[in-house]
């Protein structure tokens, strides 16, 4: 079980505040780590993760804040997505994992500054067109290992199948091994917290689940025991052509 974070600054008061549209940023985090003291914090669910909103002064946006500003959560999401696309460069580049699962790629926001109310690295997972363009270029659907908020690894389904053939294993066996690897990282993370409580604030765990991206439908699915977990639902990503001027 991931320990919930408790180091975030509490609001000095509960009064709603004016939201500056040019300062709204998205963050992605495991829902267990999102501060629990204010149930009104706006969270957009994506499996066991939560997308939440912060402003330039690092305040998390709540229900009362969007009501005060007469803005919907949907509009806030659109504003934050488009703002970040304009301000940050996102890349997918070759990488290696510790146990060399397969040929890996890593999502990265090149010029993000976490201290300046920037998005965390993992939120690039939901940027319009990012996974779609990469998947089309690779001619393959994708498997995603959301190791933590800084390291989100991508594997092509084509390469996973190639690994299965080379090692004479079923795809289910390889995917279960990926799930076990992720679980081991979570256990190591929790054990490290026992030794160094600050470690959980450096690179928090993101998800318990391996994800599958279908490029035809532009949707994410969660895996369980090497197969798509139909009970977990799906998360539909925005198409690239949804980007538009919304900051005015």
PLM feature spans:
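Extended, low-hydrophobicity segments enriched in charged/polar residues
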Residues: 1-106
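Serine/threonine-rich low-complexity intrinsically disordered regions
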Residues: 4, 20, 25, 30, ...
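Long, positively charged binding patches that form subdomain-scale interaction surfaces
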Residues: 70-149, 161-162
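C-terminal structured domains
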Residues: 116-248
């Amino acid at each position: 079980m991931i320990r919930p974070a408790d180091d975030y600054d509490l609001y000095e008061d509960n009064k709603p505040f004016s939201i500056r549209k040019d300062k709204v940023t998205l963050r992605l985090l495991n829902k267990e780590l999102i501060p629990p003291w204010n149930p009104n914090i706006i969270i957009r669910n994506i499996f066991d993760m939560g997308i939440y909103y912060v402003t330039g002064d690092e305040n998390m946006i709540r229900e009362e804040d969007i009501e005060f500003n007469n803005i919907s959560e949907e509009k806030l999401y659109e504003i934050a997505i488009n703002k970040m696309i304009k301000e940050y460069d996102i890349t997918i580049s070759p990488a290696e994992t510790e146990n060399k699962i397969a040929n890996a790629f890593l999502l990265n926001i090149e010029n993000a500054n976490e201290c300046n109310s920037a998005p965390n690295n993992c939120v690039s997972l939901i940027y319009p067109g990012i996974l779609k363009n990469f998947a089309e270029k690779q001619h393959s659907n994708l498997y995603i290992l959301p190791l933590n908020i800084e390291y989100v690894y991508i594997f092509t389904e084509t390469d996973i199948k190639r690994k299965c053939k080379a090692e004479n294993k079923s795809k289910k066996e390889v995917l279960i091994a990926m799930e076990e690897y992720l679980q081991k990282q979570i256990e190591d993370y929790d054990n490290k917290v026992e030794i160094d409580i600050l470690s959980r604030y450096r690179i928090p765990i993101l998800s318990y689940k391996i994800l599958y991206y279908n490029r035809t439908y532009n949707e994410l699915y969660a895996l369980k025991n090497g197969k798509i977990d139909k009970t977990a639902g799906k998360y539909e990503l925005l198409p690239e052509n949804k980007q538009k001027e919304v900051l005015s």
